[in-house]
Regions:
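N-terminal domain-onset segments
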Residues: 1-54, 117-119
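Short linear sequence motifs
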Residues: 14, 28, 79, 99-100
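Short non-domain terminal segments
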Residues: 19, 49-50, 59, 84, ...
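Proteins with a high burden of low-complexity, intrinsically disordered sequence enriched in S/T/G/P/A and R
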Residues: 23-26, 56-62, 88
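A generic structural signal for solvent-exposed, polar alpha-helical segments
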Residues: 27, 64, 112-113
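Hydrophobic/aromatic-rich, well-ordered segments within soluble, folded domains that form packed cores
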Residues: 48-66
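Acidic, aromatic-enriched beta-alpha/helix-loop junctions
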Residues: 61-95
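Helix-rich interaction surfaces within compact, conserved domain-sized segments
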Residues: 81-119
Length: 119
């Protein structure tokens, strides 16, 4: 499995972020491939990663580590979340007015049924 979740821009912004945006390789290897959980009931789907900036949250349930394309839950405004696809490389490279998107280093894989944010 090849991972291209690092670019020169991401490395530079990581200095602002104060930590690596990208999760450890062992963690990435445990995330199901895109479409792998289509038949899994929503309550049983596992969020493997959590990213945030201000009130915005992104939860990763499936990932293509070669392209950075992820499937998951994104809530950019409170109460306005939806399931869909987003690109982790694009999120990692965002830097607007000193704000960046951060990876929640304390987040453990969690089923939807246990994520109060998604209920």
């Amino acid at each position: 499995m090849t991972t291209v979740l690092t670019t020169p821009e991401i490395k530079a912004i990581d200095k602002i972020r104060g930590h690596r945006f990208n999760p450890p390789k062992k963690q990435v290897e445990k995330i199901p491939a895109l479409y792998a959980t289509e038949q899994t009931p929503t309550a049983d789907k596992i969020a493997h990663l959590h990213f945030f900036s201000g009130n915005a949250d992104w939860y990763v349930f499936e990932l293509d580590p070669e392209t950075g394309l992820a499937f998951g839950w994104a809530e950019l405004l409170p109460g306005c979340g939806e399931w869909g696809y987003f690109n982790l490389i694009e999120l990692a490279e965002l830097h607007v007015n000193g704000r960046v998107i951060e990876r929640d280093g304390w987040f453990d894989p969690t089923p939807v049924a246990e994520l109060k944010e998604l209920r």
